[in-house]
Amino acid sequence: MDVFKQSEVWFVIGSQNLYGPKTLQQVMDNAHQVVNSLNSEAGLPVKLVLKPLVTTPDEITALCREANYDTACIGIMTWLHTFSPAKMWIGGLSILNKPLLQFHTQFNAQIPWETMDMDFMNLNQTAHGGREFGFIGARMRQQHSVITGHWQDKEAHQRIGQWMRVAAAKQESQQLKVARFGDNMREVAVTEGDKVAAQIQFGYSVNAYGIGDLVAVVDAVSKGDIDTLVEEYEATYRFSDAVKLNGDKRENLLDAARIELGMKRFLEQGGFKAFTTNFENLYGLKQLPGLAVQRLMQQGYGFGGEGDWKTAALLRILKVMGTGLKGGTSFMEDYTYNFQPGNDLVVGSHMLEVCPSIAKEEKPLLDVQHLGIGGKADPARLIFSTPAGPALNASLIDMGNRFRLLVNVVDTVEQPHPLPKLPVARAIWQAQPSLATAAEAWIIAGGAHHTVFSQAVGVDELRLYAEMHGIEFLLIDNDTTLPAFKNEIRWNEVYYQLNR
């Protein structure tokens, strides 16, 4: 999934004409060096494109308007090398609808104590030029990101890369289409929500399709395409005896391959990058899509079970953010607990649909086993465990007057004992700060039972994503205490009521 290749971030230098052509030329020469260095040495996921120097209100407004309509541009990164009077930026910032990052840096890392004169001081004015720019953003009540540090600093590089990933995710959100196969699981509350409000807030559209629409595409899949896909399965996974050639569940595997091919074809034809299924809406399908969903998630699609479109969209967004990073991202559900003093654990899984991008095993086991839910034939699925390491669970919920993004930091652990009778993929983790506090805080905040589990994307990216969209962000980690967490929820309630 190469979502960054066609994207770019515009690097914009603001100044004013009173400095004269010589100084302004030096500013642009320095900017060229900074951009070239960042593109070649900083490991950024998205290319920086240096734009012409802007020194007047008309130039700034024209540039912001151009950025809005350029589909390759996912955001603007500004550097106030000199002083740029911020009233000049009001017109441009008032129409800008792309993410904005203020890089508060300067060309020189250290002060040249013995040679510094007023010419040097006039050229290198980031320290107060950046403050002028910051004021107008605050005065206009426009949230923009600020990163401070020298342009050769590794930490600054990392933070710029994070911002780029989130900017790309916002761009993806604006064009994302989510397909719901069937409707919501009956009587379930948290998977419901205001899809119109979500499209206004995030940009993505959510539409439902009768299961018959999918079945028609599935039934049209050819035997040759199925055979080719099964060959891919055989090269990629370990097979149980039941699904090997002449195995008693071989036909179930072929049916699963047909469903995968049909489902992917449907999504591709409609331009969908996320989807949901529901085991209560399976008429015409021979089995609940398990293997198909797992493999589509690994290819970058978002997914939510039981019609959970918010989790499906969020999963796609995190897939975009985490492109190229170590670790995977999956649909997940807190399934059962291990209450043991000093070793409280959570087993996360789902009926079938856990993404192999988080698999510890190089070749997961492909098997067909009974599923007591859905009333269909035994479904195919990949079975694996998850490697130890830091991770998080994220949930997007509709609070009526706002959307809330809830995140719990967790520590994934090695599976402590074999699970010979559990025929599904799973992850096992210790919740921060403890199982008791994390679970109570999650429940108090109304967090969903479905989550996006990620070992690739971190808290900083999700907090920034919430800021870019103007939604509530709540974090449960080692610093969380329940009294403070409850107070934060109360304060947020007041803020979002006043800020409607």
Swiss-Prot record:
One of its GO terms (biological process) is L-arabinose catabolic process to xylulose 5-phosphate. Pathway: Carbohydrate degradation; L-arabinose degradation via L-ribulose; D-xylulose 5-phosphate from L-arabinose (bacterial route): step 1/3. It holds the Pfam family AraA_central. Keywords: Arabinose catabolism, Carbohydrate metabolism, Isomerase, Manganese, Metal-binding. Mn(2+) binds at E306, E333, H350, H450. Its EC number is 5.3.1.4. GO terms for molecular function: L-arabinose isomerase activity; manganese ion binding. SUPFAM superfamilies: FucI/AraA C-terminal domain-like (SSF50443), FucI/AraA N-terminal and middle domains (SSF53743). InterPro entries: Ara_Isoase_C, AraA_central, AraA_N, AraA_N_sf, Fuc/Ara_isomerase_C, Fucose_isomerase_N/cen_sf, Lara_isomerase. The keyword Metal-binding applies. PANTHER family: L-ARABINOSE ISOMERASE (PTHR38464:SF1). Homohexamer. Catalyzes the conversion of L-arabinose to L-ribulose. This is L-arabinose isomerase.
